[in-house]
Amino acid sequence: EEREVYTEAGFDEKEQAYFHGEKREESFTMEEIGEKENFIGDFGGVLYFYKISGNKKDQKRFYYKDFTGRVNLAKKFGGIKIYRDQFRVRPYGEYGDNDFDWLELSARRNRSPAGLGKENGNWRVGSEQILGTVSISRKNTNLEAAANRNGIQEGIGFSQLKRILLFVISEFERDRQFVGRKLARY
C-alpha cells in the first residue's frame, strides 16, 4: 500500500525519505524573513502540526497516521505557548482563552480557505492544528512583561516575534501543501 501511494502520487526518493522521518532543517536570515533589524535577539522554539481528523480517503493517503482522539489532544496540549526562562508566560496558547490563537491563525485561514490538496490558493494551518513552545529569556529586552504581569507588552519586539513565527509557519504550510497536492493525485 505504501509503495502504491508513493508511486501514484509521484514522490521521488528524496521525498520518500522525508516521509520516513528524515529531518529537514531550514534557516533564514532576518533579511530573507523581511526584517531589517533584529529587535528581539535570540530565541528558540518547537512547533508541531497534527491533522485532527480524516475521512476514509485521507486515512488511506495518510496510512501511517492514527487520527483517533486528536481533538482532545488539541484541548489539552494545543496552542503555541511562550516560556521566559522556563516559566510559562500566560495567557498565550491557553485553550479556551482569547489568547489561545494569539497569532490569529484561524482568521488567516478564513481569509485563504484553500484545501490542502487544491491546486489553487494557499492552504493555511488552523490554530487547533498546531502546538508548540517559544522560548525567550530576560535577555530579550524588547519582549517585556506587560504591566499587569499577564503577557508580553505590545510593541516593536512582540510584533517582530509574531511576524517571524508567521513566516516560519508559512514555510511549513508551503511544504505541507506540496505534500498535500501530491497526495491529491493518489
Question: Model-flagged regions — what are they?
Answer:
Residues 6-10, 15, 20-186:
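Charged regulatory segments coupled to nucleotide-binding catalytic modules in large multidomain enzymes
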